[in-house]
Amino acid sequence: MQMTDTVKKILANYEGENPGVKGNLARMLMTGKLAGTGKMIILPVDQGFEHGPARSFAKNPLGYDPHYHYQLAIDAGLNAYAAPLGMIEAGADSFAGQIPTILKCNSANSLMSDTAGKNQAVTATVQDALRLGCAAIGFTIYPGSDMALDMFEEISEMRAEAASVGIPTVIWSYPRGEAITKDGETAIDIAAYAAQIAALLGAHIIKIKLSTDHLENKDAKKVYEDQGIDISTQAKRVEHCMQAAFGGRRIVVFSGGAAKGSDAVYED
């Protein structure tokens, strides 16, 4: 498929990047039902790590099989499939070339103490991504956690290594931790800040949560009110978060959030 002008315009925003990085970005942007539109939907399947197998897959036992998720992403016409090392390896041969993959390089689990600092363990490498033909690496950061600075340093090093071999980086920027309230995790000022941090760390694709109109930080709240920043609708909040990602020069995707009914999804 010939690359569209829309995709060419997006790639032009990634100045200073090598052809390998841009080629892999194009590979994802030109795949699936949204190919060429500049829009992107990624299927992320790391729930087994985060929540355990029964909580993740018991309602649909087919989900225990990694091949199911590959095929789901292909059949749905998505742009890419993201998962931890073991799941990507389990279908790498059977589905080679059929769907771009994103290797999730760090993960957490729900067996740890609630008092442990919010953090994730590095569980895969850039060399794994190369070996498996992945289109990108993925990494989660927790702005607001006491461990956030360590996470920033980890992804900075991994991002540099990945870019040197032509692999883009997707950063899941999910605010949480000791310095942020539960409502603050999806507050618009915090969501925009999370997008900015990911962009500053060099993310080629930024994944954040859809935000509410809550303003968490009192200093930021004053600026939002004084400057009349419109955060009244979901569309305006999405627009503002994209503005925080270098004025729309970086691809931003949004997490689906908590489980909800079809009507709520359509309303979003």
Task: Please describe what each predicted stretch is.
Residues 1-46:
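N-terminal basic, low-complexity leaders that serve as flexible interaction/assembly modules and, when applicable
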Residues 1-2, 35, 40, 47-256, ...:
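Alpha/beta enzyme core
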